[in-house]
């Protein structure tokens, strides 16, 4: 019996896939089809897959061509599969010609001509493109423009800004500049907002009233009542309003959450997060920049609060804020520390744009702890550590686009399906806003 094996993602299974499977089947007596897992696709940078693994497996099974279906989960697995399953022929489409010649040591390699004029990429690209307008004053706008190029069906549009010194040359082009916020709304299907936090409410409300979807850098608003109003407005109009915290979309960060919640370090007793950066800004000297410059609690607070609330929840019993201000009006904090007490745990965060500290994340448990080195908010590696160092484990994951790429993809999926693909839940977004509102109201605060 001649065994044949082939691999693919098989997203949105189409005639081209079926023809390739038919020709692969004709090469032997028994066809094994390897379907790539969601994780493996993501690790390879293939982020535009629209169907889940099980949907893709069932689509392949429904063709009746596969005698056996396996899941491809890691780089180098093809060699293991060929040896383990006693495969005689490996086959794949001719667009990969030469790529898999190294497998000739283990079996015969055949490259099959693909059916021209049809591909999953083309099918995905035929969907209406969502034009994403950019609002604000931040170099992150350049990253959004760059990362949007990796998301099929999303196109970076014009930008509206009070200061273009942050912008890349491509965004500085006159054709990319919106004359006004209204002009930007008219030219966009959706918006990414990173303007001054106190402007978010008005800008988002106008966007929703005009039927635009919104991805807004956290905090979405400065008051919880405003957040509830905007959420309800988006829901009533069947629009997407998503809180943007890129760290939530890092594969490594998401995996460490699962491990921690799964009890790998026992009961979680403490979460400590630090986020600092040195910003060249003097609010007493630069009045123009103060129109859009973020203070430390707004710039870093949502990121530092994220693991605390995702691991311990939002039901803390008390909190204490200690802060040091740069200006006499007490708007710009150079440094802020917040301590939380929960019924069975504690947490703390340190944020600052006028101090520098080790930007690590430590999650302490009754059996061990998880350590994420600086900068933890760009997580691609972390360690699970125990009393006996021999039991320690290290985890590595590829980080593409600092999480922004996957965040944009989730935003687009939410727009197209009407489902919630956000990795930041509504109750966490609301609690982030509440903590920042308490900061602005000087509640539970000590000024140092």
Q: Where are the regions a protein language model picked out?
A:
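Nucleotidyltransferase catalytic core that binds NTPs
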Residues: 1-129
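N-terminal Rossmann-like dinucleotide-binding module
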Residues: 129-173
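Hydrophobic residues in well-ordered beta-strands that form the structural core
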Residues: 33, 216-217, 241-243, 372
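C-terminal helix-rich "cap/oligomerization" subdomain common to oxidoreductases
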Residues: 134, 187-195, 410-448
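Predominantly a Rossmann-like dinucleotide-binding segment in NAD(P)-dependent oxidoreductases
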Residues: 248-319
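Contiguous beta-strand/loop segments that form the cofactor/metal-binding neighborhood of enzyme cores
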Residues: 299-378, 409-419
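Rossmann-fold dehydrogenase core element
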Residues: 228-246, 267-271
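Beta-loop-alpha module in the N-terminal Rossmann-like domain of NAD(P)-dependent dehydrogenases
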Residues: 173-233
């Amino acid at each position: 019996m001649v065994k044949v094996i082939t691999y693919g993602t098989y997203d949105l299974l189409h005639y081209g896939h079926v023809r390739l499977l038919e020709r692969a089947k004709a090469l032997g007596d028994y066809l094994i089809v390897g379907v790539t897992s969601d994780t493996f696709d993501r690790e390879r940078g293939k982020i535009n897959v629209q169907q889940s693994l099980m949907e893709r497996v069932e689509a392949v099974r429904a063709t009746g061509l596969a005698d056996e279906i396996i899941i491809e989960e890691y780089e180098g697995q093809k060699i293991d599969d060929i040896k383990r399953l006693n495969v005689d022929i490996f086959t794949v489409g001719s667009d990969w010609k030469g790529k898999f010649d190294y497998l000739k040591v283990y079996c015969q390699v055949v490259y099959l001509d693909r059916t021209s004029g049809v591909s999953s990429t083309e099918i995905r690209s035929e969907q209406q493109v969502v034009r994403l307008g950019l609002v604000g004053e931040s170099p992150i706008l350049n990253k959004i423009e760059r990362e949007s190029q990796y998301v099929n069906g999303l196109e970076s549009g014009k930008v509206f800004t009070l200061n273009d010194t942050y912008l890349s040359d491509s965004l500085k082009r006159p054709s990319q500049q919106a004359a006004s916020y209204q002009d930007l709304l008219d030219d966009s299907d959706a918006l990414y907002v990173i303007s001054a936090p106190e402007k978010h409410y008005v800008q988002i409300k106008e966007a929703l009233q005009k039927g635009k979807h919104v991805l807004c850098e956290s905090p979405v608003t400065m008051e919880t009542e405003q957040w509830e109003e905007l959420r309800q407005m988006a829901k009533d109009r069947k629009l997407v309003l998503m809180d943007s915290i890129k760290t939530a979309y890092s594969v490594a960060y998401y995996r460490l959450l699962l491990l921690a919640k799964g009890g790998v370090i026992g009961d979680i007793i403490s979460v400590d997060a630090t986020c600092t950066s040195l910003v060249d800004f003097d609010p007493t000297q630069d009045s123009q920049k103060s129109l859009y410059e973020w203070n430390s609690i707004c710039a870093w607070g949502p990121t530092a609060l994220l693991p605390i609330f995702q691991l311990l929840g939002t039901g803390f019993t008390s909190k204490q804020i200690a802060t040091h201000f740069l200006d006499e009006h007490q708007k710009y904090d150079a440094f802020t520390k917040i301590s939380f007490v929960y019924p069975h745990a504690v947490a703390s965060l340190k944020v600052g744009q006028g101090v520098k500290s080790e930007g690590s994340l430590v999650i302490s448990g009754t059996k061990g702890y998880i350590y994420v080195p600086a900068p933890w908010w760009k997580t691609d590696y972390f360690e699970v550590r125990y009393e006996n160092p021999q039991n320690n484990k290290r985890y590595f994951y590829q980080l593409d686009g600092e999480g922004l790429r996957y965040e944009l993809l989730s935003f687009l999926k939410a727009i197209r399906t009407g489902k919630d693909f956000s990795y930041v839940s509504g109750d966490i977004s609301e609690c982030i806003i509440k903590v920042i509102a308490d900061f602005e109201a000087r509640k539970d605060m000590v000024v140092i």
